[in-house]
């Protein structure tokens, strides 16, 4: 009988990527097939996030539901991974003794051995260590699911912003070697992937080893990825202003595969609050980056993260944030009310902004961003946008749907053979959450740039011969 695996994922795109790798790994080693129904599963995995408020209680609430399933099926294996597991592993074991496996973001590759151990002697396993980049060496080959894919290029963060748990839960920055990244992307391209989103907690801090032992920059990596035939669109997230160097901006000037959209978190427009946050940059330095970017790529649109109600934030500080939002003209944002994360320096600060004031500031900020986003959408009316067709529209099975470079969903009439390809669409209608258009050009008429085939990249970067024997590539 087929063994089944259920994974519940909370949090960032890195967690989504990790969960997909867990599924691929346990399919390869144990034959587990994914199911959306927890009651059907032989193994339940919870991939957690500790960024938001009450993250721990959310975990225990979910585990309480799964405990009932285990009471009915004692052979059921329950595992908790992700950032809450990394931060609170022993506490989870003490409070939820029925949990069999606790693993961190850097030890998910050891899940097969952990499951075997639990199956063997029923002893619980806790492994929340930080074995650097080892996990990527033990994951199965990537499997494409549609024309877009996420690829993790680094882990961790060295910035230690005062509100953030990432350095404590995912460790400090560790970069994957460039050949490993290119090999994975080339494999995805060979399976029909057209757009890759490079992931990292501080993605533009990537400094990976090249085949000759030298260290490559993030700008170098972007150009190498863009050279792979079939990869015609590149995104990356999440970046940090302090690492946004001029060589990255030059890639925007000369590499059309890099989209005209950037998510660059700023958090606040007040230098005083930025200093309390440990951000190590000013609002003016942030605006200077945007100015250079728009000189290199005039049509680029910017999104950001904001925290409102940080300890000590005054009305004047908030007004400076609103001024920054207007000056940059952000297209969208992920914005949240400050909530202290245990173990961070900000948790020891006096949270002196009233809750109602925080909510009011968040409402004002989000309303302004929404207005700016709609204005950006209206400017697209009558323009021709290049769309990567992802599949049928959720609005109508008779229509197709895809995304623009600036991440707008566009619905339009088309044929099934367009799925997985690019089309140029004239925007005819603008709605709050989507656009509508009509196809004016198909991919065959575009003459997309070709540089190096995926097969060539695979042959150049693979670490073993046809017999599976590893070899040294000078």
From Swiss-Prot:
The MTTase N-terminal domain covers which part of the protein?
3-120
Catalysis: reaction(s): N(6)-dimethylallyladenosine(37) in tRNA + (sulfur carrier)-SH + AH2 + 2 S-adenosyl-L-methionine = 2-methylsulfanyl-N(6)-dimethylallyladenosine(37) in tRNA + (sulfur carrier)-H + 5'-deoxyadenosine + L-methionine + A + S-adenosyl-L-homocysteine + 2 H(+)
- In short, the EC number is 2.8.4.3
The answer to whether UniProt assigns keyword Transferase to this entry is yes
Subunit comment: Monomer.
Domain of life the protein comes from: Bacteria
Disulfide bond annotation, renumbered to this chain: none
Q: Which PANTHER family match?
A: CDK5 REGULATORY SUBUNIT-ASSOCIATED PROTEIN 1, MITOCHONDRIAL TRNA METHYLTHIOTRANSFERASE CDK5RAP1
What is the designated name of this protein?
Answer: tRNA-2-methylthio-N(6)-dimethylallyladenosine synthase
Entries under Pfam families matching the protein = Radical_SAM, TRAM, UPF0004
Question: Where in or outside the cell?
Answer: Cytoplasm
| Domain TRAM intervals | 378-441
Q: Which residues are recorded as binding [4Fe-4S] cluster 2?
A: 157, 161, 164
Q: Keywords of this protein's UniProt record, alphabetized? A: 4Fe-4S, Cytoplasm, Iron, Iron-sulfur, Metal-binding, S-adenosyl-L-methionine, Transferase, tRNA processing
Q: Which family does it belong to?
A: Belongs to the methylthiotransferase family. MiaB subfamily.
Q: Quote the cellular component terms of the Gene Ontology held in the record.
A: cytosol
| Main location per the UniProt record | cytoplasm
Give every Radical SAM core domain span: 143-375
Q: Cofactor note from UniProt? A: Binds 2 [4Fe-4S] clusters. One cluster is coordinated with 3 cysteines and an exchangeable S-adenosyl-L-methionine.
* Cofactor(s) listed in the protein's UniProt record: [4Fe-4S] cluster
Role this protein plays = Catalyzes the methylthiolation of N6-(dimethylallyl)adenosine (i(6)A), leading to the formation of 2-methylthio-N6-(dimethylallyl)adenosine (ms(2)i(6)A) at position 37 in tRNAs that read codons beginning with uridine.
Example GO molecular function term?
metal ion binding
Q: Where does [4Fe-4S] cluster 1 bind?
A: 12, 49, 83
């Amino acid at each position: 009988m087929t063994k089944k695996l259920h994974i519940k994922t909370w949090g960032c795109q890195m967690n989504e990527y990790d969960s997909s790798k867990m599924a691929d790994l346990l399919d390869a080693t144990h034959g587990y097939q994914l199911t959306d129904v927890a009651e059907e599963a032989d193994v339940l995995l919870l991939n957690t996030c500790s960024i938001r408020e009450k993250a721990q209680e959310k975990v225990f609430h979910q585990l309480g539901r799964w405990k009932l399933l285990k009471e009915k099926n004692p052979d059921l294996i329950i595992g908790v991974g992700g950032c809450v597991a990394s931060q609170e592993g022993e506490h989870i074991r003490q409070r939820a003794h029925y949990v069999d496996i606790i693993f961190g973001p850097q030890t998910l590759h050891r899940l097969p051995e952990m499951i075997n151990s639990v199956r063997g002697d029923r002893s619980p396993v806790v492994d929340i260590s930080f074995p650097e980049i080892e996990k990527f060496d033990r994951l199965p080959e990537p499997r494409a699911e549609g024309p877009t894919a996420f690829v993790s290029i680094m882990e961790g963060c060295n910035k230690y912003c005062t509100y953030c748990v990432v350095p404590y839960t995912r460790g400090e920055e560790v970069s994957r070697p460039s050949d490993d990244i290119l090999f994975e992307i080339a494999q995805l391209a060979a399976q029909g992937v057209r757009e890759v989103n490079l992931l990292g907690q501080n993605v533009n801090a990537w400094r990976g080893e090249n085949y000759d032992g030298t260290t490559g920059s993030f700008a170098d990596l972007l150009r190498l990825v863009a050279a792979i035939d079939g990869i015609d669109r590149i995104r990356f997230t999440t970046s940090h202003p302090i690492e946004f160097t001029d060589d990255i901006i030059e890639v925007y000037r000369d590499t059309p595969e890099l989209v005209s959209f950037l998510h660059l978190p700023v958090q606040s427009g007040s230098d005083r609050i930025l200093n309390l946050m440990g951000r190590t940059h000013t609002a003016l330095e942030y605006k200077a980056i945007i100015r250079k970017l728009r000189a290199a790529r005039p049509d680029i649109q910017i999104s950001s993260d904001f925290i409102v109600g940080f300890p000590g934030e005054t009305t004047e500080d908030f007004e400076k944030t609103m001024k920054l939002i207007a000056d940059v003209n952000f297209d969208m944002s992920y914005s949240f009310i400050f909530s202290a994360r245990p173990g961070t320096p900000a948790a020891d600060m006096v949270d002196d902004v009233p809750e109602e004031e925080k909510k009011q500031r968040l409402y004002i900020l989000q309303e302004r961003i929404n207005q700016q986003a709609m204005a950006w959408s209206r400017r697209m009316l009558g323009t021709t946008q290049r769309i990567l067709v992802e599949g049928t529209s959720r609005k109508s099975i008779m229509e197709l749907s895809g995304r623009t470079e600036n991440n707008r969903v566009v619905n339009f009439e088309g044929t099934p053979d367009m799925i997985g390809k690019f089309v140029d669409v004239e925007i005819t209608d603008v709605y709050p959450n989507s656009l509508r258009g009509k196809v004016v050009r198909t991919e065959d008429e575009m003459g997309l740039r070709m540089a190096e085939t995926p097969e060539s990249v695979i042959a150049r970067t693979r670490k073993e011969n046809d017999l599976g024997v590893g070899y040294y590539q000078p």
